[in-house]
């Protein structure tokens, strides 16, 4: 693009640039209201709550869920015991004996009976998950305005640079505008409806939960309710401000003769993340305080507060692959065109930044971590309980947090991990007679750390080891010694103690994990590869932490010996990396889980540089598994191929991840991306969005080997571009630009003094860094 004709015309140039920026603003937009929640409605959030707005013309629907509202848990029945099967460990030796004898069916039957978690069900259950529970929708706000005339110029949009949603349209000369946002500092949502001419509105709230009290006074609506199966108490409030007349009649708020009204929305529960009761929050008092703080603040004040807070995080990273080309199509139509082979680099950078938007909107300090759907859930019985799945999903949700410069957004996960340690110690003791703590696949807000109640999907004692990796990663990216000393390392050490006790020596002298089960694939086994790779990684991270903190020399020595005895990755008969110790991998198997490649990503045991034979075996395994799979599976494969430095293959998988799914007119694939850019497992799961974004970052920078590699897997399609603000292990912030596939500029800022080893296309440099200073690097 040439701007030469505007030289010497600063006003014209500034106007052009402003218009060009507006044209290329990062936003999703549509020319019709949403008809479907998961594929079309648009998400907003403040970390504590998530809401989806549909943009209906005569009737707006805003569905929302508060992050701590759950069924199940201690209040659901007197027998709730966090899924623990007391003295289950007594059956561990018999299961191991059967495995040693090769009696796998008998071992599976015994483990299924005695090493699975306990689930109680009753007729009062709101979900199919019994007293384990499920995340709950809080309810829906319906805002009705009766339009009898034809609407024109309709537009529904989500501006992810401001984290605000909009609906605009005209009826004749009357212009209508709606604005929606979630404010984290003030812990509220705000919805503003405006029109040139006065209108009448009716606002109603609907909840699937039992109503215990409802009131309206001085523009403040309160709905207090109870989750029927566990007695969890909650309250949601709407504070209405308007230039019209506000009243309450027959359970509905009426706003008459108004050119505008604003609904300030808060919601809280009595939940506290404190084992073993998980209750006691003064939710009514909290809401009262939240409403009181609105005094003297205008909508614009809260909007400004929100933007400053959000943009402080969002604007850390600027990712540019290209401008919009051709017609400015609605997002759903852009996605369809992209699926038919059209290059759309603007859409790709939008997807990356949309993932960051979702993380900022759903995971902030003091909130619960993201669940399978972030903070967005419209059901009392959601898929997989909308819980915290520890056999890939929960981890993938946070893969981009550090590299995408959102370290603060990982704090809820770190705090949640810490809350699992105490109940996880009970699980380790009762199921495995082991020290330390562990979790399996399914985890809820109520300390459920036991094996799941179904053995093939629920038995995964490596869950704590895997999730503990995030604690070490947070340290590596931030270099926060106090975090490592006071929070991360004590948790990591306890997770490692579990493996010190659980690993058993086999006839070859190797330490193996058994019984084990490669996540959701195969059968019970003696030594699933993923278990060994996770244990190796955990020990390795603990050893590094001991060295940083200069503590625990004896423990470091002990686990170094154990780490080096763990059964190593094995290459099988057709060149594959084996998923089990037995060479039984099927080259025609296309299973979605690729668990045995953990050591390649997100682990560090396998790399092209240090273990080329193992790396080649992972390539063979990936080729055999193919390029299909669920949404999150596709995202994981983007990361795998990036680690193998095959940017074009990673990009091929990335494009596959963005294939449309769930469209009314056609459904091209069984998994991919919905019209609102949510990832489709299906159904909607947020992990695919996050894994896809992490994979894009892996193409541009990698630092897992201790060397900061620049553009390690740049796809040919991304001929030119730039990215500013990505983070790397070691505490570095990176700005990169490239042209015609070659590095153009590189600058690095470090949080600490010391050497930084850099690698670009086989050329290595070492730069001496000074904390806070930026270094320009030439290759």
Model-based region annotation:
Residues 6, 10-456, 473-475, 493-496, ...:
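Aromatic-residue-lined binding/catalytic grooves and analogous aromatic/hydrophobic interfacial grooves
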């Amino acid at each position: 693009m040439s701007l030469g004709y505007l030289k010497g015309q600063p006003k014209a140039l500034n106007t052009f640039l402003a218009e060009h920026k507006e044209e290329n603003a990062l936003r999703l937009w549509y020319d019709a209201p949403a008809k479907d929640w998961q594929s079309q409605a648009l998400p907003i959030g403040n970390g504590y709550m998530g809401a989806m707005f549909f943009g209906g013309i005569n009737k707006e629907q805003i569905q929302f869920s508060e992050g701590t509202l759950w069924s199940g848990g201690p209040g659901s029945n007197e027998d709730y015991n966090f899924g623990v099967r007391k003295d289950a460990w007594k059956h561990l030796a018999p299961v191991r004996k059967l495995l040693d004898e090769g009696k796998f069916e008998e071992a599976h039957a015994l483990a299924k009976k005695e090493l699975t978690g306990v689930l109680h069900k009753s007729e009062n259950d709101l979900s199919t998950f019994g007293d384990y529970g499920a995340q709950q929708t809080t309810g829906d706000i319906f805002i009705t305005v009766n339009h009898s005339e034809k609407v024109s110029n309709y537009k529904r949009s989500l501006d992810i640079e401001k984290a605000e949603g909009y609906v605009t349209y005209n009826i004749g000369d009357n212009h209508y505008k709606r604005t929606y946002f979630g404010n984290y500092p003030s812990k509220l949502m705000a919805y503003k409806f405006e029109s040139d001419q006065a209108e009448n509105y009716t606002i109603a709230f609907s909840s699937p939960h039992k109503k215990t009290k409802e009131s309206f006074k001085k523009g403040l609506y309160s709905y207090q309710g109870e989750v029927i199966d566990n007695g969890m108490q909650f309250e949601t409030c709407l504070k209405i401000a308007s230039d019209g007349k506000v009243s309450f009649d027959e359970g509905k708020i009426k706003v008459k003769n108004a050119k505008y009204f604003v609904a300030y929305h808060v919601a809280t529960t009595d939940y506290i993340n404190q084992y073993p009761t998980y209750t006691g929050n003064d939710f009514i008092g909290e809401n009262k305080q939240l409403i009181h703080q609105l005094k003297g603040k205008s909508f614009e004040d809260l909007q400004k507060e929100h933007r400053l807070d959000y943009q402080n995080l969002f604007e850390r990273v600027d990712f540019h692959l290209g401008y919009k080309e051709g017609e400015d199509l609605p997002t759903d139509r852009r996605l369809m065109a992209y699926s038919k082979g059209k290059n759309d680099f603007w859409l790709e950078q939008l997807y990356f930044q949309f993932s960051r938007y979702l993380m900022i909107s759903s995971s902030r300090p003091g909130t619960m971590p993201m669940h399978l759907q972030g903070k967005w859930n419209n059901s009392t019985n959601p898929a997989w309980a909308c819980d915290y799945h520890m056999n890939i999903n929960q981890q993938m949700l946070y893969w981009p947090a550090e590299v995408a410069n959102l370290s603060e957004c990982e704090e809820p996960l770190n705090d949640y991990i810490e809350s699992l340690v105490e109940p996880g110690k009970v699980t380790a003791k009762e199921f495995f007679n082991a020290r330390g703590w562990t979790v399996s696949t399914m985890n809820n807000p109520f300390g459920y750390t036991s094996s799941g109640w179904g053995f093939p999907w629920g038995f995964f004692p490596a869950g704590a080891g895997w999730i503990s990796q995030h604690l070490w990663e947070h340290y590596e990216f931030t270099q926060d010694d106090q975090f490592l000393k006071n929070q991360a390392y004590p948790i990591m050490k306890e997770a490692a103690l579990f493996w010190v006790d659980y690993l058993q020596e086999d006839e070859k002298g190797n330490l193996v994990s058994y019984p084990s089960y490669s996540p959701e694939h195969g059968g019970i086994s003696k030594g699933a590869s993923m278990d060994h790779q996770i244990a190796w990684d955990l020990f390795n991270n603990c050893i590094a932490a001991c060295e940083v903190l200069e503590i625990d020399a004896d423990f470091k020595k002990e686990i170094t010996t154990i780490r080096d005895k763990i059964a190593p990755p094995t290459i099988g008969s057709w060149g594959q990396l084996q998923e089990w110790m037995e060479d039984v991998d099927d080259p025609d198997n296309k299973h979605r889980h690729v668990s045995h490649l953990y050591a390649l990503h997100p682990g560090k045991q396998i790399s092209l540089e240090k273990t080329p034979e193992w790396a080649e075996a992972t390539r063979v395994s990936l080729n055999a598994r193919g390029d299909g799979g669920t949404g999150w599976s596709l995202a994981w494969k983007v990361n795998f191929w990036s680690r193998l430095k095959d940017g074009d293959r990673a990009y091929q998988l990335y494009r596959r991840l963005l294939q449309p799914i769930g469209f009314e007119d056609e459904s091209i694939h069984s998994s991919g991306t919905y019209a609102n850019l949510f990832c489709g497992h299906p159904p909607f799961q947020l992990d695919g969005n996050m894994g896809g974004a992490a994979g894009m970052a892996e193409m541009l920078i990698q630092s897992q080997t201790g060397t900061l590699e620049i553009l390690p897997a740049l796809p040919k399609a991304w001929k030119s571009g730039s990215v500013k603000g990505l983070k790397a292990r070691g505490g570095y912030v990176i700005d990169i630009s490239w042209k015609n596939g070659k590095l153009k500029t590189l600058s690095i800022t470090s949080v600490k003094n010391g050497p930084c080893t850099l690698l670009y296309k086989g050329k290595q440099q070492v730069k001496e860094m000074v904390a806070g200073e930026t270094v320009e690097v030439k290759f």
